[in-house]
Amino acid sequence: VNNEYLNLLSNMKIPVVLVDRDVKYTGHAGVFIDNEYGAFEATKLLLENGHSNIALIAGPTNTVPGRGRRKGYQDAFKFMNIPVREELIFNGDFSITSGKLITRHILADYPDVTAIFSCNNHMTLGCISELMEVGKKIPDDMALVGFDDLPLVKIFHYQLTVVDRSSREMGYQAMKLMSKMLKG
């Protein structure tokens, strides 16, 4: 969502409900996920299960989800009084390819990593693909937590924990909000 698009919406003088893209200071209502909290809870779960060498396949730092999920990861370590290993934070681009390449790098250069937190479904698919190629079993050989649900993964019976953004629920809440706005 860029400024030109937001200005166009504002000038149209119609009710607008943004979904899943929290654009600050626009005056538009919206339904958003708390990226920071979701990443915090996912990372805390891994830490509580004995993992301390957790690699993060983060999104781009120029995106709200990328920054929020990275901060949630870092905050969970601080909350648990465990030092954050900054060298285990890798920037992906929300693509399958980046998830695969970063996972390959993690496996080659950081053998002490026991868990990976991947910050979106495409990068998680890339991570799964690389783990499968090298014969690593999830969760036996590598714990994996993803952000965004992956219904396809259930077909292969992976034990994968995900932060589910529930598009259906966000759409439902957005329609309730829009209905309320239209009723005045």
Placement of each model-derived feature along the sequence:
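Bacterial carbohydrate/catabolite-sensing allosteric modules
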Residues: N3-G184
